[in-house]
């Protein structure tokens, strides 16, 4: 069996409480999960059970105060900004609500080029990649010049997926 690509071991996420001597709020208490290459996993649970918090911990957006978050064998729980930026080539997120995750004032091309620009991809290569991404998610190439509001919810979800795939994670 192959080693996990993502391995969360006893992850704890705590947030400080306001007030003198109040114990921190434990948003996650010892959560473990491993995902192997090529595996698809869905997290299911009650509202407030920590699904989003675990995702945020993996992405470095929630403070991991215990346990480990290993990506390809490296503990990424306490990576700084430069390390996170380099890691963004390998880890991307597709948000649950695609409309609020897409900037309404940018064209689809601008939205898809943004992660490529951050990684210093040449403009000509980025434009070519946009066409590939649209094709990959089943949208016509003329979608690049349109705004998010011009698409259905399902099409916006495909645009969000295309953005996540832009860097070939």
PLM region spans:
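ABC ATPase NBD coupling module
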Residues: 19-23, 63, 76-92, 110, ...
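The feature captures the beta-strand-to-loop junction immediately N-terminal to the Walker
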Residues: 44-46
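Helix-to-loop junction immediately C-terminal to a conserved catalytic motif
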Residues: 59
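Conserved ABC ATPase "signature" region
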Residues: 75, 124-142
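Conserved ABC ATPase signature
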Residues: 147-151, 155
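Hydrophobic anchor residue at the start of the ABC signature
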Residues: 161
């Amino acid at each position: 069996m192959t080693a996990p690509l993502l391995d969360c071991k006893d992850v704890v996420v705590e947030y400080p409480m306001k007030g003198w001597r109040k114990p921190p709020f434990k948003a996650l208490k010892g959560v473990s999960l491993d995902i192997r290459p090529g595996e698809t996993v869905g997290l299911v649970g009650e509202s407030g059970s920590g699904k989003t918090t675990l995702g945020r911990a993996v992405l470095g957006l929630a403070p991991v105060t215990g346990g480990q978050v290993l990506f390809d064998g490296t503990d990424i729980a306490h990576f700084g900004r430069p390390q996170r930026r380099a890691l963004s080539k390998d880890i991307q997120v597709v948000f649950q609500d695609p409309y609020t995750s897409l900037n309404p004032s940018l064209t689809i091309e601008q939205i898809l080029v943004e992660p490529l620009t951050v990684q210093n991809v040449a403009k000509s290569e980025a434009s070519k990649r946009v066409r590939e991404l649209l094709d990959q998610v089943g949208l016509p190439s003329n979608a690049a010049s349109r705004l998010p509001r011009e698409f259905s919810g399902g099409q916006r979800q495909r645009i969000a997926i295309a953005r996540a795939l832009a860097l070939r994670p």
